[in-house]
Each structure stands twice: as structure tokens, then as C-alpha cells.
């Protein structure tokens, strides 16, 4: 019940501002790409955060606060530091995802002769991860853009907020590049599947063509009409077999000359 209520609050509004307070709702990604909704309430320089689980972004930020408390005189400073840390984490996730895309690309190139359905599953999984990261950083961009419009937020923190926005825009470019690479890999995979299917169809087509003349010859001599001298010929059976073999060899030679095989 509490999870549903928090999700409803989080979805209803990312940012609410009154005369002296800010309520910001944002999703923080875990290492397993699950989203953790976090609610921030800041009033008179005091920051309160509401979340269900521990997050690395908070732990790292708290360490920075304890090491040098002078750099964090108010909750506004802590809030900005939290978003800075979170964006850095998002950048690390994008870098890890990019490495996975590179490995997948190498795997597809190495297995170009035999494609596996598991590769397509991996592509879809990476597409989902990139989508989640993009949604996450878009969420941060929306909240920080609203904070920049706040008239009582400390002006000294505006440059840092602006820098976060620039970093987020850079991450958008990386996610777009990731989408492009994954689309290319998906097209490559489907192309390899088509090539493999065409090879199979080609093999069956060649087999059908090769055995078509022998089948025709066998069918002709299987008619058993009265006026078929070969049926009563001593070497008729060998003649039919030889004719079948000759037709197969002839077709194979034609295919070789035409470079169809």
C-alpha cells in the first residue's frame, strides 16, 4: 500500500514549489537497473529525503558531507551534491552499457556464420537498459530545470546546476548513440538470419533441381507402355541409370560454370 501511494505521489508531480519550500520527486537507478523513487522536501535550508532502500548515491554524498561539512552549509548544497553524484552514476551505467554493446558487436561479428536467437535477446535487453537510463536522466533534467527557476534557491549553486544540465545533455547524446548502435546490430542480426535462411533455401533448391531430371527419367520409364523398346533391351536398366547420373553431373557442371555453387 505504501509503495503504491509513493508511486502515485511520484507520478503526480515531479516538482512542487511553495513560497518557502520545494518538493521534488525523482527516480534513482540501482545497479540492477531498477528504479527507486525518492522524494525530496527542502524548507528553510533543511533537506529531508524519503526512500525505501539504501542507494549508493546517498552513501557517497554523505561521505563527502562528513569529510568536509563546510562545503555543505545547507540542505540546498546537499541536494545539488546528490544530483551531481547521481548523474555521475548514470554516466558510469552508460559507459558499462556501451562496453556491453561493444562486446555484443564483436560476438555478432565472430558468429556471423551461425547466428543464435540469444543474440537478439541480448540486443533487446540492452535496448531496454538504455531506455531506462534515458528516462532516468530525463527525469533529473526536468527536476533541475525547475529548481533553476526557483527564486529562493541559493544563486551560488546555479553554476553547478547548469553544469549538471550540460552533463545530462551529453549523456543524452551517448544514449542516442547507443540506440543507433543497437539498431544497427539488430539490423545486422536480422540480415545474417536472412542470409542463413537464403542459404538453406538455396541448398534445397539446388537439390530439387539436381534430382528433377533423374526423377523425370525414372517417371518416363516407369510408364510401362508397350512401345518402349528400352524396357526389353538387355542394357536398358544400365542405360537409364547412366542417363540419370549424366543428367546430375551435367547440372552440377552448369552450376559450377555459372558460379551458382
Locations of regions flagged by a protein language model:
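General structural signal for secondary-structure boundaries
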Residues: 1-3, 74, 117, 213
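Extended amphipathic alpha-helical scaffolding segments in membrane-proximal extra-membrane regions
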Residues: 19, 27-192
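Aromatic-residue hotspot detector
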Residues: 16-17, 91, 109, 225, ...
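Hydrophobic alpha-helical transmembrane segments and their immediately adjacent juxtamembrane loops
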Residues: 169-261
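Extended, Lys/Arg-enriched charged tracts that mediate electrostatic binding to polyanionic substrates
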Residues: 4-34
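Proline-rich low-complexity regions
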Residues: 12-14, 92, 138-139, 229
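N-terminal pre-transmembrane cytosolic regions of membrane proteins
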Residues: 1-6, 65
Amino acid at each position: 500500500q505504501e509503495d503504491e501511494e509513493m508511486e502515485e505521489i511520484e507520478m503526480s508531480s515531479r516538482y512542487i514549489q511553495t513560497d518557502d519550500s520545494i518538493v521534488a520527486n525523482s527516480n534513482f537507478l540501482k545497479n540492477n537497473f531498477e528504479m527507486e523513487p525518492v522524494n525530496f522536501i527542502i524548507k528553510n535550508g533543511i533537506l529531508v529525503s524519503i526512500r525505501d532502500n539504501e542507494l549508493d548515491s546517498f552513501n557517497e554524498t554523505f561521505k563527502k558531507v562528513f569529510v568536509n561539512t563546510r562545503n555543505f552549509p545547507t540542505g540546498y548544497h546537499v541536494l545539488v551534491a546528490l544530483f551531481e553524484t547521481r548523474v555521475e552514476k548514470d554516466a558510469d551505467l552508460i559507459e558499462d552499457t556501451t562496453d556491453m554493446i561493444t562486446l555484443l558487436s564483436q560476438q555478432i561479428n565472430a558468429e556471423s556464420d551461425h547466428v543464435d536467437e540469444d543474440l537478439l535477446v541480448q540486443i533487446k535487453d540492452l535496448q531496454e537498459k538504455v531506455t531506462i537510463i534515458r528516462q532516468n536522466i530525463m527525469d533529473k533534467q526536468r527536476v533541475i530545470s525547475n529548481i533553476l527557476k526557483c527564486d529562493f534557491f541559493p544563486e551560488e549553486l546555479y553554476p553547478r546546476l547548469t553544469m549538471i544540465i550540460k552533463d545530462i545533455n551529453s549523456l543524452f547524446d551517448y544514449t542516442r548513440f547507443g540506440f543507433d548502435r543497437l539498431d544497427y546490430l539488430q539490423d545486422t542480426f536480422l540480415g545474417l538470419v536472412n542470409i542463413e535462411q537464403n542459404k538453406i533455401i538455396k541448398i534445397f533448391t539446388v537439390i530439387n533441381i539436381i534430382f528433377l531430371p533423374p526423377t523425370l527419367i525414372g517417371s518416363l520409364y516407369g510408364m510401362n507402355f508397350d512401345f518402349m523398346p528400352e524396357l526389353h533391351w538387355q542394357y536398358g536398366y544400365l542405360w537409364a541409370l547412366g542417363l540419370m547420373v549424366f543428367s546430375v553431373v551435367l547440372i552440377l557442371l552448369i552450376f559450377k560454370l555459372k558460379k551458382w555453387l
